[in-house]
Amino acid sequence: MTEMITYLTELNIAITIFFGAYLLIFRKDSNFATRRVYLLFAMVASFVIPLLRFNIATPAGTLNTTLITLPEVILQGSATSTAQHTTSLTEILLVCYIAVSTFFVGKLLAGLTRIVIQSATSEKKWLNGVRVHISKELHASSFFSLIFIDPAQSNNEDLNHILEHETFHARLGHSLDRLMAEVLLVISWFNPVVWMLRKAIVVNHEYQADNRVIEHGTDQVSYQLTILNQYIGSASISNQFSNQIKNRINMINKNYKKGSSWKGLMLFPVSIALVFFMACGNEEAMNNQNAEEASNEHVQKQTEEEIFYVVEQMPQWPGEEDL
């Protein structure tokens, strides 16, 4: 129980620090490939770093530990009820955490099941040399090599742009990033930074796919009109959708800077700092645990010794026998 809480705490500290560095470094950067590598590394490192354990050896003779065992004191009354209350509160929080995590697991599995069913039952066609699944249930999307699209919802020019956009999603393997983000969400749904990270991954995928479409030779103005038609045709444009359209179009008009890939080197100092921080915390916890175990062994050894209730030989003083 304690180890799980420690792992979750360190995982969320790591992901928060990584994402904070991402906002500082990559907020206005247009090198989407480097941004993607950073976000992927941040997720993987956040899972792995808390698992690292280091044992920094202490030179012999420099550490002198003295264990003092005090008699056991049993507290009664209000102290006992307080301990029981604390235990029950911990159990309630654990049950709530597991319940919400189970909900997100079910939601993830339901989404994957829906994709599997649609891929098995939908009509397959070849459009512009790409094998697609015709589906009215799923909006234009991709999952690894599967591409879902509904030709009836778009004209020919928009359909070509949408198909090209989803094809680049599939080729770049964006579904792997999304799946990792969903797993992280299942574990750390209580951390708002994880929700922000998940959104940042999705947004960066859109920017990267848009950039590839433009680099492939698609007319920039007509492609931007396709983006507008997609949002206008789907629903009434809310403030959130309006910002998404604005940001995507701004990124399309922004020059792609390949030279900014050096920013990915920031992964190393952030990772080293986190490893050192986690290692120091783990070392202190291990030392405390070892000291506690040693103390328990000492107490157990004392309790296992023979206890005398009757004096076998009475003490005598010099000259007492002559009395």
Predicted segments, located by residue:
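Charge-biased low-complexity segments
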Residues: 285-323
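Hydrophobic topogenic segments
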Residues: 2-294
